[in-house]
C-alpha cells in the first residue's frame, strides 16, 4: 500500500496550526443513544438514513474502546458542563473527549509503519489512468519528477472541500484538485449542502472565524441600517451559546 500526501503526513485543515486537536463525543450512557440519534437526524433535515445513524451512534463506544486498547487514550474534560463542549451540531452536553494532534501523529504514524505502508509525502496527484472502465493507476509528481504508479485500486481519501470556494477559512495549501481528478473519471460530489459553514470576518481581519458565542456582543443590521433581531432577541442570544449555526 502506498499513501500519498500533498504536504507532510498529518497536515491540511485537520491539523491547522491554530487548533489544539480533535474533540469527540459519545453518548452519555446507554439511555442517551436515542437522543443523540435524534439530534443527528434533526440537523440532517430528512437526508440522514436512520439505520446508518443508528449504526454510527452504536459504534462510537466500541470505536473509542478500540483506540484505548491499542494505546491511544482520549483526554477527559475537566469541566464537562462548559458550553464549549457542546458540539457544533448538537443541543446538549454528552460525554466529551479529546485527542491531541501530537498523540494522533505518534499513534497513527506507528500504525502505518507496523502495516508496512509506504509514505510519499510532498507528492502531488496529477491524474488517474484508466484501462477500459477501471482505474489502473495514478500519475504523480514526486521529488521533481513525474511518476506513474500502477495500482489495482485507488482510494481518494482527501479533504480539501473548502478549496472549492473563493472565500474560505483554511490555509492556502488546501486544494480541491483531487475533486477535479475524481470528476474527470466519472465521480460526483454529493451532499455539498451539508458542509458545515462557519461565518468569517471580511474586515478588519479577513479569514478569521466569527464564533457563534460572539453574537451576544454583536449588532446585526440590514442594508438600511435597521436592527435585524429586535424580536426574540433573548431567544437568539441563548441559542448563540451553542451550535449549529442553522439554529442560531
What are these regions (language model features)?
Residues 2-4, 161-162, 166-169, 177-180, ...:
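Glycine-rich phosphate/pyrophosphate-binding loops
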Residues 7, 151-153, 157-162:
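Glycine-/small-residue-rich beta->alpha transition segments that form the dinucleotide
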Residues 1-17, 28:
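Glycine-rich FAD pyrophosphate-binding loop
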Residues 181, 187-248:
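An anion/pyrophosphate-binding glycine-rich loop and adjacent beta-alpha core
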